[in-house]
Amino acid sequence: MLQKVLTIAGSDTSGGAGIQADLKTFQELNVYGMTALTTIVTMSPEQWQHQVFPIGLDVLESQLKTAFSVGIDALKTGMLGSVDVIELAASYIDKHDMKRIVIDPVMVCKGENEVLHPETADALREVLIKRALVVTPNLFEASQLAKSTPIKTLDDMKEAAAAIYEKGAKYVLIKGGKQLEHEKAVDLLYDGKNYCLFEAEKVDTTFNHGAGCTYAAAIAAELAKGRTVEDAVGLAKQFISKAVRHGFRLNDFVGPVMHAAHRRF
């Protein structure tokens, strides 16, 4: 029987990120995906400006009731968007004693510079992170969660990971990607004692829309199969590295990663 994974996240109408990226990842990795929508994100055809439409809490809770009644082997969160949504998600995690939880602390839409809801950083930090098996911030998100200066080096990553770990996550995975001052695309996994590096060749591309969502979804999929966190991250790193390497142009504004790259190339 297929393992079941729930994503609590936003819908990206362009199909590259959010629950669309999650479901594509789940399908590619042979797990059964379910969704609970928190927001719908659209983009203007003229300049690709983002608009975020929140889903009502009552509608979100109805979705959660449905998904949890089916049974869930792992859970992943993406764009939650408000303190109320974070608290609702946390209540369902507690009620159903979920253990395999991947928190992708989404704070911005790709292409946007502003934090969507600045107050969500505090709620993510104080309410949700302590419930995570793995939390997967990028460099910007990690600096926000750790309340640190911008992260530029591997030592900066280690300091931020330790600060985030103190908030209660079992594992902290900071994604260095191509932004870190390092010869390779490096991600750092910290379990409170040991630092483990996951490396891949850097890819000079802007066609990486949905990379963070896809990476976290791949980790959740592998955890659902019973893999250790280290093995799940290693397999997910291989999956996302190939997906980024074969990212493609969707239109004049955006290019997503290719979820099928692991079997096509």
Predicted regions and their residues:
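Conserved phosphate/ATP/ADP-binding segment of small-molecule kinases
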Residues: 118-194
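Short pre-catalytic strand/loop immediately N-terminal to key active-site residues, enriched for Gly-Thr
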Residues: 8-14, 195-209
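Short, small-residue alpha-helix embedded
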Residues: 20, 144, 206-229
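Conserved N-terminal subdomain of the carbohydrate kinase-like
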Residues: 2-7, 27-110, 114
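Charged C-terminal helix
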Residues: 230-265
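Phosphate-handling active-site elements
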Residues: 29-34, 196, 222-235
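N-terminal basic/disordered segments at the start of proteins
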Residues: 15-32
